[in-house]
Swiss-Prot record:
Oligomer and partners: Component of the Mediator complex.
Gene Ontology CC terms: nucleus
Compartments where found: Nucleus
Function summary: Component of the Mediator complex, a coactivator involved in the regulated transcription of nearly all RNA polymerase II-dependent genes. Mediator functions as a bridge to convey information from gene-specific regulatory proteins to the basal RNA polymerase II transcription machinery. Mediator is recruited to promoters by direct interactions with regulatory proteins and serves as a scaffold for the assembly of a functional preinitiation complex with RNA polymerase II and the general transcription factors.
Region (Disordered): 308-332, 647-691
Record motif LXXLL motif, residues: 691-695
Record-stated family: Belongs to the Mediator complex subunit 25 family.
Record's keyword annotation contains Transcription: yes
PANTHER family: MEDIATOR OF RNA POLYMERASE II TRANSCRIPTION SUBUNIT 25
Official protein name in the record: Mediator of RNA polymerase II transcription subunit 25
Compositional bias annotation for Low complexity: 647-678
Gene designation: med25
Keywords: Activator, Nucleus, Transcription, Transcription regulation
Length: 805
């Protein structure tokens, strides 16, 4: 195993998975994926794959997938290749999309075709990484059959090479070759041995197989040691697990060999990343022995691991979040390892603020000295609270967050990183106090440093001393993902001079925001105009992405945020309109109408049509709801109502003479048979001025309606879905109280006396032939001035857009 190639120890990796895509591997692939492939991806990714983790195409780990088949796949190509990606989440989706087909009649597979394509990918990686330099190259072969004794034919560069020639070529180029197979095939072991890098003396390989039938030959990465009972997919070994002085070692500790321990540091100091594997192996042995001692001793006895086998531990504590305090041995300077499958598998979606409990060879902090007198046992499953801080913490699925531990330390900057800039980062957040105004903003700032990889040319001499950051909501990250491509990646590190601001930064970046837009003012003569600060909840680091295409990125993020604001404003307008509609419906409907609605929830009167639609009831089956009726400007609506009230006596006088032969007027006490499909109406429609307003707007053209009702035509336009034509069987001619209704040839009119009871209206009336006429008026879209004005005033400029513009 190459000790100089830890997963996230600052070395950028190029990883190619070469997988047999035949039915011979299909039944075993899920087990291999679960036990080996996902842990390997987490090893290179620095944590479980997350959809919001983005890395630059030229600055992070690159993954590529090659799927090869057998000779019976003709006329299809022997190999399918996926272009490189820097997203581990996307790569896992590629793995899940493989269709294992064919190969049932073949005893071999076209491994030579797959390896030749993989070598071509590494050639492409070399061109892509010219600015970065040397990278850590890994090729992983996953198959269940030996290779054909045939040379590669589909590759242009490596055509004619046999499988053995290709693996030798892989070793000569310094590519670490690994083999994962569900069976122990001698031919595959021979390929692994021939692919040994030139001049490298390998130690005895470890047994990483989780099943005795599997053959796992690994080079250039670290997997969980074989025989573990833990569920795969735990935190990869490159993330150091902090060691609190807990007396409890759960039985599931056997999975701990997959975790490294960082070297010792004084309390509350930065923790450098572990670059050797011997420490992890020693920690694994001590953890297993501690688990055995836990089973052999009494429940109230707390065994200590052998100090000769225990590696030095860091001052970073494991996060805890619930009482009671742990029982502490008096020798608090002796650390103990506590890991469990449950805690390791806890999702990392919680805020990254942790209460720290530190131990080490040096003097113990005050918190531990205060707890030293307590010797009571604590069950293994019980969460524990640190003595100081009082800050709630997530489960230990976020082990590497030194900075957030009361935040006094932070995830370290790798030793091979170079300091590029040092200054202050400033941002605004909403105060946590409930009594503070919602529009109030709290300005915070923190000293920070920007680190780059060796060899990267980042001109920061013209950068301002203070950088202003605007927070980006978490829901926009997936939309902004494509904009993060083709970017240079830097690492931000914050000092702990202002603990309150550091807490606030981790709180907001770990809960509702996971990104910030750092804008460089135009007054500074630097080439960078915008920088995206991302927080990786898995890696517990702040990454800065500097887009190579600055103008394109600015335009893209401006468009994304503008669209997001428009969607938010539309939701706010809809909620406001629904609230206004409910207020109108409950405040202006007569009491007798409301009482009827309570008794007859299935029947909907005309007078209730507009407000009740806002409450989810429909006028008739299939009719769409209309929120436009309630979206008029309040002042314009009041003026229209007053205007119509003045004109009503004139309407009554003008409509009295044309009463003729077919007028159907009903006395107060007489029953009336309503037409099938006709809408019900309240006893006194005139008691509601807004509904009377709507009814008057529906007068047929033959009744001389004054032209002063024209301002309400746009209201009628919006209500067309509520007042359908004859095709829907709805006949709704309405008249104001006190007016005789006129039935002209080809029309059906109804009139109801104010004193008539609702029960009589439920009877049926014979249908009257004729056509239904609607009031004349403009049918095109009529602008709603009041609504447009409200929308124009309600769209506010976002802080990020202001800075970007």
């Amino acid at each position: 195993m190459d000790a100089a190639t830890p997963g996230n120890g600052g070395i950028i990796s190029d990883v190619v998975f070469v997988i047999e895509g035949t039915a011979n591997l299909g039944p075993y692939f899920e087990s291999l994926r679960k036990h080996y492939l996902l842990p390997a991806i987490e090893y290179f990714n620095g944590g479980p794959p997350a959809e919001t983790d983005f890395g630059g195409d030229y600055g992070g780990t690159q993954y590529s997938l090659v799927v090869f088949n057998t000779v019976d796949c003709a006329p299809e190509s022997y190999v399918q290749c996926h272009a490189p990606t820097s997203s581990a989440y996307e790569f896992v989706q590629w793995l899940d999309s493989i269709r294992f087909m064919g190969g049932g009649g073949e005893s071999c597979s076209l491994i030579a075709e797959g390896l030749s394509t993989a070598l071509q990918l590494f050639d492409d990686f070399k061109k892509m990484r010219e600015q970065i330099g040397q990278t850590h190259k890994v090729c992983i072969l996953i198959c269940n059959s030996p290779p054909y004794l045939l040379p590669a034919v589909e590759s242009t560069t490596y055509s004619g090479y046999t499988t053995e020639n290709l693996v030798q070529k892989i070793g000569e180029r310094g590519i670490h070759f690994s083999v994962i197979s569900p069976r122990k095939l001698p031919a595959l072991r021979t390929l692994f041995e021939k692919a040994m890098p030139v001049g490298l003396i390998e130690p005895q390989p470890k047994d990483y197989s989780q099943d005795p039938r599997h053959m796992i030959l690994v080079r250039g990465m670290v997997l969980p040691v074989g025989g573990a009972t833990s569920v795969p997919g735990v935190i990869p070994p490159k993330q150091p697990i902090s060691q609190p002085p807990l007396p409890v070692v759960p039985p599931q500790i056997a999975n701990a060999p997959s975790h490294q321990l960082p070297p010792v540091q004084p309390p509350y100091m930065q923790v450098p990343q572990q670059n050797t594997l011997t420490t992890a192996h020693a920690a694994a042995q001590s953890a297993v022995e501690a688990a055995k001692n836990q089973k052999n001793n009494l429940p109230n006895r707390f065994p200590l691991p052998n100090l000769n086998q225990m590696p030095p531990t860091s001052a970073v504590g494991t996060p805890f979040n619930q009482p009671p305090p742990p029982a502490m041995p008096q020798n608090t300077s002796v650390p103990k390892m506590v890991t469990s499958t449950a805690s390791l598998m806890t999702p990392a979606s919680q805020p990254s603020l942790v209460t720290t409990v530190t131990t080490g060879p040096g003097p113990a902090p005050v918190q531990l000295q205060q707890q030293g007198a307590q010797q009571q046992p604590v069950p293994p499953s019980m969460p524990i609270t640190g003595a100081a801080g009082g800050v709630q913490a997530p489960q230990p699925s976020q082990p590497q967050i030194g900075t957030a531990q009361l935040p006094c330390t932070q995830t370290p900057v790798n030793g091979n990183k170079l300091l590029a800039w040092s200054g202050v980062l400033e941002w605004q957040e909403k105060p946590r106090s409930v009594s503070v105004d919602n529009n109030a903003k709290l300005t915070r700032s923190l000293p920070c440093q920007v680190y780059v990889n060796p060899g990267e040319n980042l001109k920061t001499d013209q950068w301002p001393q203070k950088l202003i950051m605007q927070l980006i909501p978490q829901q926009l990250l997936t939309t902004l993902g494509p904009l993060f491509r083709n970017s240079r990646m830097v690492q931000f590190h914050f000092t702990n001079k202002d603990l309150e601001s550091l807490k606030g930064l981790y709180r907001i970046m770990g809960s509702g925001f996971q990104a910030g837009c750092v804008h460089f003012p135009h007054t500074t003569p630097c080439e960078v105009r915008v920088l995206m600060l991302l927080y990786s909840s898995k890696k517990k680091i702040f990454m800065g992405l500097i887009p190579n295409d600055q103008s394109g990125f600015v335009n893209g993020i401006r468009q994304v945020i503008t669209n997001h604001k428009q969607v938010q404003m539309q939701k706010i307008d809809q909620q406001r309109n629904m609230g206004a509609g409910q207020a109108v419906g409950t405040g202006n409907v007569p009491a007798n109408t409301q009482a009827f609605l309570q008794k007859q929830p299935g029947a909907l009167p005309v007078a209730q049509a507009v407000p009740q639609q806002m409450q989810g009831q429909q006028v008739a089956p299939g009719m769409p709801s209309i929120s436009q009726v309630t979206m008029m400007d309040e002042q314009q609506r009041t003026q229209n109502l007053l205007h119509i009230r003045v004109q009503q006596p004139q309407q009554a006088a003008s409509q009295a003479p044309p009463q003729a032969t077919q007028t159907t007027v009903q006395a107060p006490g007489q029953p009336q048979n309503p037409q099938p499909g006709a809408m019900l109406r309240p006893q006194n429609p005139g008691a509601n001025p807004q509904l009377r307003n709507l009814l008057l707007s529906q007068q047929p053209p033959q009744t001389s309606v004054p032209q002063t009702q024209q301002p309400l035509h746009h209201m009628q336009q919006a209500a067309q879905g509520m007042l359908p034509h004859q095709a829907m069987g709805q006949q709704m001619q309405h008249q104001a109280p006190g007016q005789q209704q006129l039935q002209l040839p080809g029309q059906t009119l109804m009139h109801q006396a104010p004193a008539q009871q609702w029960g009589n209206q439920m009877q049926q009336r014979a249908p009257i032939p004729g056509t239904l006429m609607m009031s004349a008026g403009p049918r095109g879209p009529v602008p709603q001035q009041g609504l447009q004005q409200v929308q124009a005033q309600s769209v506010m400029e976002d802080d990020i857009l202001m800075d970007l513009i």
